[in-house]
Amino acid sequence: MAKAKFERTKPHCNIGTIGHVDHGKTSLTAAITKVLAETGGATFTAYDQIDKAPEEKARGITISTAHVEYETTNRHYAHVDCPGHADYVKNMITGAAQMDGGILVVSAADGPMPQTREHILLARQVGVPALVVFLNKCDMVDDPELLELVEMEVRELLSKYDFPGDDIPIIKGSALAALENSDQKLGHDAILELMKAVDAYIPQPERPIDQPFLMPVEDVFSISGRGTVVTGRVERGIVKVGEEIEIVGIRDTQKTTCTGVEMFRKLLDQGQAGDNIGCLLRGTKREDVERGQVLCKPGSVKPHTKFKAEAYILTKEEGGRHTPFFTNYRPQFYFRTTDVTGVVHLPEGTEMVMPGDNIAMEVHLIVPIAMEEKLRFAIREGGRTVGAGVVASIIE
């Protein structure tokens, strides 16, 4: 079946829902599509559909972040809904990395919870530029003073992680009320107010479209009769159908050709920075590509294993380590979409690193990763984030 061409008329923005498990992230995502569907800006997507991430299910491989698209009068949005459980933190990291802005969902009945804090920290870590808060389940709280208290708590928490807590819009409402049409003000109207805040407060991202093409590989599919499709979000630049590209990282660099680009099941003649695309690769086998590699313009990025980094090690209270670590510490380094084991070498005169420290360190990875200065990473142990860092300089 021929696919419809994807029209680019409005500016595009990637956002997503973050927050504690069961605070209503997926319900809110469904509610946004329901309310915007009234004006033709979306197709209503029910909770259980989002929960199942339908577009990936069709290919027999599931991606744990669900994508929906919708538009307001000002913008076109691609919205990711990240699962809330702590063991999905890996996807939270890739999900949050896919955001020009985030909607932090906090239950008014519970207030901020451990994952609220963790997701704000992760948003800060992966460089989400702006957050808007939806105080959900307000229909369950009768006391206006209690609502104010929760709002204050949320603002304090945001400020603690270097978001402008005093300025961030906080919209009070109920996703369920919007889905069930039970309370116009807390439901329908609050959702419209939220979208207004998202339009106004989340800055239109400047797309690094003029830089050389780079796309981190998130998933790889084999589509019968068409070949291998690699999905991910284009980090920068443009890939045109027919262009030669390189697959860099983890293994030896390979050359291939992009023979097709699709977005939301529609064909494009090119994919550009900010787009979530599937890229069809000529002559590349499913097993030749894996999550953690990047597709890029030939020669633009090299794989490296040794670099100097500036890192922040989380405190115990932030969910980090309880004990110090020493030279030859071997955690995982989470680059873009994957964990790679590496060995830490501390600078002369630094005996050990305590939770809460900032540290300049040298890292030797066991496999090469496509990297450049300013690339961010998380430091993890057994699936738990224990630090955040940035590549300061490359050694080799």
UniProtKB/Swiss-Prot annotation:
Q: Which HAMAP family match?
A: EF_Tu_B (MF_00118_B)
**Catalyzed chemical reaction(s):** GTP + H2O = GDP + phosphate + H(+)
Cite the residue spans of the region called G4.
136-139
What family is it from?
Belongs to the TRAFAC class translation factor GTPase superfamily. Classic translation factor GTPase family. EF-Tu/EF-1A subfamily.
Q: Where is this region: G5?
A: 174-176
Cite the PROSITE patterns for this sequence.
G_TR_1 (PS00301), G_TR_2 (PS51722)
The record describes its quaternary structure and partners as:
Monomer.
Where is the region G3?
Answer: 81-84
Checking InterPro entries in the record gives: EF-Tu_GTP-bd, EF-Tu_GTPase, EFTu-like_2, EFTU_2, G_TR_CS, P-loop_NTPase, Small_GTP-bd, T_Tr_GTP-bd_dom
Molecular function GO labels: GTP binding; GTPase activity; guanosine tetraphosphate binding; translation elongation factor activity
Tell me a GO cellular component: cytosol
Where is GTP bound in this sequence? 19-26, 81-85, 136-139
Where in the cell is the protein located? Cytoplasm
Q: What is this protein called?
A: Elongation factor Tu
A Pfam entry, by short name = GTP_EFTU_D3
Location of the region described as G2 in the Swiss-Prot/TrEMBL record: 60-64
Q: What does this chain do?
A: GTP hydrolase that promotes the GTP-dependent binding of aminoacyl-tRNA to the A-site of ribosomes during protein biosynthesis.
Which parts of the sequence bind Mg(2+)?
Answer: T26
Where do the record's region annotations for G1 lie?
A: 19-26
Which EC number applies?
Answer: 3.6.5.3
**Record keywords: Nucleotide-binding included?**
yes
- Give the species this sequence originates from: Rhodopseudomonas palustris (strain HaA2)
Q: Which residues form the tr-type G domain?
A: 10-206
